[in-house]
Amino acid sequence: MKAPIEVSPLAWLDAVEQQRRAAGLRRSLRPRPPVATELDLASNDYLGLSQHPDVIDGGVAALRMWGAGATGSRLVTGDTELHQQFESELADYVGAASGLLFSSGYAANLGAVVGLSGRGALVVSDAYSHASLVDACRLSRARVVVTPHRDVDAVRAALQDRDEERAVVITESVFSTDGALAPLRELHEVCRRHRALLIVDEAHGLGVRGGGRGLVFEAGLAGAPDVVMTTTLSKALGSQGGAVLGPAAVRAHLIDAARTFIFDTGLAPAAVGAARAALGVLRAEPWRSGAVLRHAGVLAEVCRVREAPQSAVVSVILGDPDVAVAAATACLDGGVRVGCFRPPTVPAGTSRLRLTARASLDDAELEVARRVLTDVLAGLG
């Protein structure tokens, strides 16, 4: 009989934490107060709708009518008229034939990619794809080819060389770390020529591009039979949850095949009600998407970013993770909260400040941002 192991099975965590600290990659949680005490340039509340009275009222009304939780999987007791109404309204807004709600954007990506690929298929994914798409590729059991960032020729080569009958190409419409736009028209043409499905994550495009309807709509691909969109309700719509939007056959298939739909509790009614109200505000106030881009331009100019931003995201690359953390801390000390992205979120050597513009920023707030960011960046030398 072997002697019992004396060391705790979690002892290895101490060494891992020390390695993270040494590399400047230790993370911590910083709770925010209910009323912001600093200027928010870090959240994904692009349209400023999370605190909009109509959005809050929409969530409260759904809460009172349907209760706090969905009470089960949507295949059991978790489906409501509210869920199906919002699915139809969101699909109509972006130009898709149908929609299916998930409990998060992460779950929507897992459900769509895994459900529409599988063993015997090829999945081609951009190197800068979000972690949810990376995990979806790993879970798909398909052969996965990762192509350089926004490289259409590499996607074409991967599709040309395949032996698999089915192929899926995955991209974000607006990449979350650098704010760059995917070359959707070119990617779609390559997919069309090689009989591949194009899955586009519109998490950062919805509400910002295409007058609010997203980059797929802007590119003229809305409603295309070989394009599927995923999105989140937690960014421009200021709520929580996710959705897959596309042909009706895709919705029907995912209801039967997407494990993150079948085995997950349905999205809470309050989240659906809030997102539905936010969509109503977006329809009534299309100026919000243009305001986001204008304000992003101001932030980019202040930070001396060379290229004008094409989304709400302004990326200020600083390189060293410790420098990025120090800069973000200095901004917060000055009253401005900014994002700080380090590996593994971004490649090594590209740690950065990630600023996000909001439609609701006013002139006084932009002036505060200008003053604090100018001082902090000047102090870096």
Curated annotation (Swiss-Prot):
Keyword field contains Transferase: yes
List of residues binding substrate: R27, H130, T345
InterPro entries: Aminotrans_II_pyridoxalP_BS, Aminotransferase_I/II_large, AON_synthase_class-II, PyrdxlP-dep_Trfase, PyrdxlP-dep_Trfase_major, PyrdxlP-dep_Trfase_small
Name of the top EC class for this enzyme: transferase
Binding-site residues for pyridoxal 5'-phosphate, renumbered to this chain: G105, Y106, S176, D201, E202, A203, H204, T232, L233, S234, K235
Cofactor(s) the record lists: pyridoxal 5'-phosphate
Highest taxon listed in the record's lineage: Bacteria
Location of N6-(pyridoxal phosphate)lysine modifications: K235
Keywords assigned by UniProt, alphabetized: Acyltransferase, Biotin biosynthesis, Pyridoxal phosphate, Transferase
Gene Ontology BP, a term: biotin biosynthetic process
Pfam annotation, one family: Aminotran_1_2
E.C. numbers: 2.3.1.47
Catalytic activity: 6-carboxyhexanoyl-[ACP] + L-alanine + H(+) = (8S)-8-amino-7-oxononanoate + holo-[ACP] + CO2
Pathway assigned to this chain's UniProt record: Cofactor biosynthesis; biotin biosynthesis
Molecular function per GO: 8-amino-7-oxononanoate synthase activity; pyridoxal phosphate binding
Function of the molecule: Catalyzes the decarboxylative condensation of pimeloyl-[acyl-carrier protein] and L-alanine to produce 8-amino-7-oxononanoate (AON), [acyl-carrier protein], and carbon dioxide.
Quaternary assembly: Homodimer.
Annotated PANTHER family: 8-AMINO-7-OXONONANOATE SYNTHASE, CLASS II AMINOTRANSFERASE/8-AMINO-7-OXONONANOATE SYNTHASE
Family membership: Belongs to the class-II pyridoxal-phosphate-dependent aminotransferase family. BioF subfamily.
Protein name: 8-amino-7-oxononanoate synthase
Biological source species: Mycolicibacterium paratuberculosis (strain ATCC BAA-968 / K-10)
Native organism taxonomy: Bacteria, Bacillati, Actinomycetota, Actinomycetes, Mycobacteriales
